[in-house]
C-alpha cells in the first residue's frame, strides 16, 4: 500500500518546513520554508560553516561598520541557505524579513528588496522566491507594495480570520495560517486535547480556505505549524502544507487511506469591500488567541534573530 505521504502529495503540494538541506533532499518536497528560528538552527550545523564564512566575506566587502556587517552577514546567510535549498527543490524558497520590522511597512519593503537583490545577483529569479512577512497590518501593506513590483510574498504568523481576509484583499501570493500554535493556545486555556477534526487550528484553516475559494481569491493557502499528522490529514486538499521533517517521516511510515477534506468550490460570491485599518484592528483584536500568538511569534523570531546576530558577531 502507498504511504500517507505519497497519497497526500496527490491532493496537496507538500512543502518542507526546515533549513536542513539533507532533510529536504530526503523528502523531495516542491518548496521549502525558512524563518529566523530555522536559520539559527541551520547555522549551528557544522556542514553549513562554509556558508557562514562566505556570508561574512560578503559583508566585510560591503562595509567597515561592524553592526552593518552583522546585518549583512545574517541576510546573506539566509540567502546562501536559500540558494542551497533551491538546488534540491524544484519550486520556491521562503525567506523571512527581520521580525523587528513587523510594524514598519517602509522598513519591510526595503529589506525585502535587499533580499531579492541578493538572490537576483546570485542568479536566482523572483519566481523561485517568496518573501515572508508577519501578517500585521504593516506587513500586509508591505506585501501589497511588493506584489505590484513582481515580488511574491508569504504572509506568516497568521492566526485570525481578519488577517486572512486582509491578505486576500491586498492580493498577496500566499498565506501561512498556523495550525499547531492555535491548538496550543486552546489546549492551555481549556486543559484538554482535541480530536483532529475539532482541532481549533484545523477549523481555522478550513474556514479560511473555504472563504477564499467561495469568493474566488487567488491567494494560496498553505497550512503551517503542525503538532501531529492528524492535523495534516484533516487538511488534505489544502493548496499547500508546510511540514517539518519529523512529521514528514511519520507520514512516510504511515499507511492507510488519505481522504480529501478540503475541496475548491471555484465560487464567485460577491466580495465585501476591503477592510479599513480600523476594521482590521477591531476584528483582529476580538480574537484573544490571535492577538497573543501574533505578538508572541514576533517576539520569539526577534529573539532568535538576536541570537543569530550574537553568534555572527563573535566570528567577525
From Swiss-Prot:
Subcellular location: Cytoplasm
EC number: 2.2.1.2
Main subcellular location of this protein, as a coarse class: cytoplasm
Cross-referenced CDD domains: Transaldolase_TalAB
Secretion signal, residue range per the UniProt entry: none
GO biological process, one term: carbohydrate metabolic process
Source superkingdom: Bacteria
Pathway: Carbohydrate degradation; pentose phosphate pathway; D-glyceraldehyde 3-phosphate and beta-D-fructose 6-phosphate from D-ribose 5-phosphate and D-xylulose 5-phosphate (non-oxidative stage): step 2/3
Keywords: Cytoplasm, Pentose shunt, Schiff base, Transferase
Record-annotated active site: 132
Pfam family, one: TAL_FSA
GO molecular function annotations of the record: transaldolase activity
Catalytic activity reported: D-sedoheptulose 7-phosphate + D-glyceraldehyde 3-phosphate = D-erythrose 4-phosphate + beta-D-fructose 6-phosphate
Annotated S-S bridges: none
One Gene Ontology cellular component annotation held by this UniProt entry: cytosol
Keyword Secreted attached: no
Record-stated family: Belongs to the transaldolase family. Type 1 subfamily.
Quaternary structure and interacting proteins, as annotated: Homodimer.
Chain's role: Transaldolase is important for the balance of metabolites in the pentose-phosphate pathway.
Name of the protein described by the UniProt record: Transaldolase
Organism of derivation: Aliivibrio fischeri (strain ATCC 700601 / ES114)
